[in-house]
Regions:
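Terminal transmembrane helical module of multi-pass membrane proteins
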Residues: 190-245
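Physicochemical signature of membrane-embedded alpha-helices that form the seven-helix bundle of GPCRs
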Residues: 42-48, 97-111, 159-170, 194-205
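Interfacial segments of alpha-helical transmembrane regions
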Residues: 34-46, 129-166
């Protein structure tokens, strides 16, 4: 006959509560799109200029010299059409479709930027923190500060801005490469100084600032995907995408 041994106390109940996640698996924070005011100001300046340019292109020949719509809105294009023949009578008479095709893409690009600004102002908030990729607020002041949009709207804003900026840079590079591979057919007649101040500098702005936007929004998208994938990210601070709650 087998006897059972008595125990001085009962066995403890098993702990069924989930264990707390380790710091490497859980972090207190959230992703956010944090464009600097520099980005926003660039868009507020460039969009009217692009609309002006697109209007000239799509309303030719009425917007060209001698046309009923030329004065006073598009008078400066009298000079620019002599600097760059792609905007002048030469390309128009030759039925060169590049100018109008680029103007059509300008419309799509501008609508994307307008939708982006709508998201920023309808769902975002201004912050004194430094925007990602922006100069320090101690030196740049307001230009370096950010607008903050988190959640799905922030992700959508970053995606739209990245796509539009890639479109801007690609379209501008195509414009430059078209000249290079045609032997500078439309701008080769200019002096070096005229070329620098009337063509390279004005058009170069649409390479520099959108490239900055690609860097900023691309970094944000990459970091957001890294967070979702469970990868390590930099610790959060005022300029990071992961905002501490």
């Amino acid at each position: 006959m087998v006897s059972t041994r008595g125990h001085p106390q009962e066995f403890p109940e098993p702990d069924l509560t989930p264990s707390r996640a380790t710091p490497s698996r859980a972090r207190k924070g959230k992703w956010a799109h944090t464009p600097s005011n520099l980005t926003i100001i660039w868009l507020l300046i460039s969009l009217p200029l692009v609309a002006w340019d697109t209007g000239y292109v799509m309303l030719r020949p009425h917007s060209m010299p001698g046309g009923s719509l030329h004065w006073p809105i598009w008078v400066p294009y009298d000079l620019y059409g002599q600097v760059d023949y792609i905007y002048g009578w030469k390309a128009f008479h030759e039925k060169n479709g590049f100018t109008a095709a680029q103007g059509f893409l300008n419309i799509i690009e501008s609508l994307m930027y307008l939708y982006y600004l709508y998201i920023l102002y309808a769902f975002g908030a201004q912050s004194r923190a430094q925007g990602r990729g922006a100069p320090k607020t101690s030196t740049a002041g307001f230009l370096g500060q950010q607008r903050y949009v988190d959640g799905q709207k922030g992700a959508l804003a970053a995606l739209v801005a990245f796509s539009a900026a890639v479109m801007t840079v690609s379209k501008t590079l195509l414009y430059w490469m078209n000249e290079y591979y045609s032997g500078f057919e439309n701008i080769g007649h200019n002096s070096l100084m005229d070329l620098i101040f009337l063509w390279i500098i004005p058009n170069g702005a649409w390479l520099v600032l959108p490239s900055y936007m690609i860097y900023v929004t691309g970094s944000e998208i990459l970091q957001g995907l890294t967070i979702v994938a469970g990868g390590a990210t930099a610790s959060s601070d005022d300029t990071a995408l992961v905002k501490t709650e």
